Amino acid sequence: MVIIRLARGGSKKRPFYNIVATDSRNRRDGRFIERVGFYNPVATKGESLRIAQDRLTYWQGVGAQLSPTVQRLVKEAQKAQPAA
């Protein structure tokens, strides 16, 4: 089963997450099929969240499930998008 979830990057105390489409059996930071976006929770300036909506829609269309955290981030991105 394909799942869209966060893969952690960055360094100690400075997390950075890639939003990736991956097989659910793979490790959290392991092999993935496609990078769909990113989330930087410690960003002070600039962009902290970017999601390629077209690719997200594609993966959901072929049956990919969203992790609970990614669902929350997608809602957050959709709320922020009309204001921008």
Swiss-Prot record:
InterPro entries: Ribosomal_bS16 (IPR000307), Ribosomal_bS16_dom_sf (IPR023803)
Protein name: Small ribosomal subunit protein bS16
GO biological process: translation
Superkingdom, natural source: Bacteria
Keyword Protein biosynthesis applies: no
Stored Gene3D superfamilies: 3.30.1320.10
Species classification: Bacteria, Pseudomonadati, Pseudomonadota, Betaproteobacteria, Burkholderiales
GO terms of molecular function: structural constituent of ribosome
A Pfam entry, by short name: Ribosomal_S16
Alphabetical list of SUPFAM superfamilies matching this protein: Ribosomal protein S16
Species whose genome carries this gene: Burkholderia cenocepacia (strain HI2424)
UniProt keyword list: Ribonucleoprotein, Ribosomal protein
Gene Ontology CC terms, in alphabetical order: cytoplasm; small ribosomal subunit
